[in-house]
Amino acid sequence: MTLKELHDYLLSFPNTWLDFPFGEETSVYKIGYAETSGKMFALIADKAKPLRLSLKCDPLLSERLREVYETVLPGYHLSKKHWNTILLTGQVPDDELRSLIQMSYNLAAGAKSD
């Protein structure tokens, strides 16, 4: 999945928007309203090689994904229990990435806090 495809997919979810609270090199995708800061559901380190995509994840699934894929790591500068960082090398198939993005969106949409 290219950066543009990823960006377009992340913004295709209802009530999502792009923010840069950590600077221009980190794209933060949020659900909610800008007036209330929203809830993060995805982050992309735009300048990293390979790209790094961080997503919220169920803690048990997080551990399983890390066992299956060497490019799935504990969340970079995030809760290691509730976030994974995926190095976008092609190891994780695009269909699975889309599924993980959907899960992250759903978790953030229903989350009371991070």
Per-range role (PLM):
Residues 1-114:
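Charge-dense, helix-prone N-terminal extensions
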